[in-house]
Amino acid sequence: MNIKITGKELKATDAIKNYIDTKAERIEKYFDTEDINLFVTIKKEGGDQVAEMQISVNGESFRAVTASNDLYASIDKDIDILEGQIRKWKLKRTSKIWQNL
């Protein structure tokens, strides 16, 4: 998995990078390819810390944006949202394959 982290008004520390790497492993299990690109943007908007994530794999794109007081909570919520989107996409894709048999 290729992960690119960008910080706007926030610095992407090693702790944040390691946390994102660890959480991104949950996404990796849904795909059998290594060609997964995860783009993460962390920024500060008002009093909130925003995590924006976008995954592109096999021509598909998934996106999540979450804001909260805690950056780590925003990252967790984004991963949960992305995981739900990917599960829904895979279920829809496999059900269409079975319908065509």
Model regions and ranges:
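N-terminal, polar/charged subdomain of small-to-medium soluble alpha/beta proteins
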Residues: M1-L101
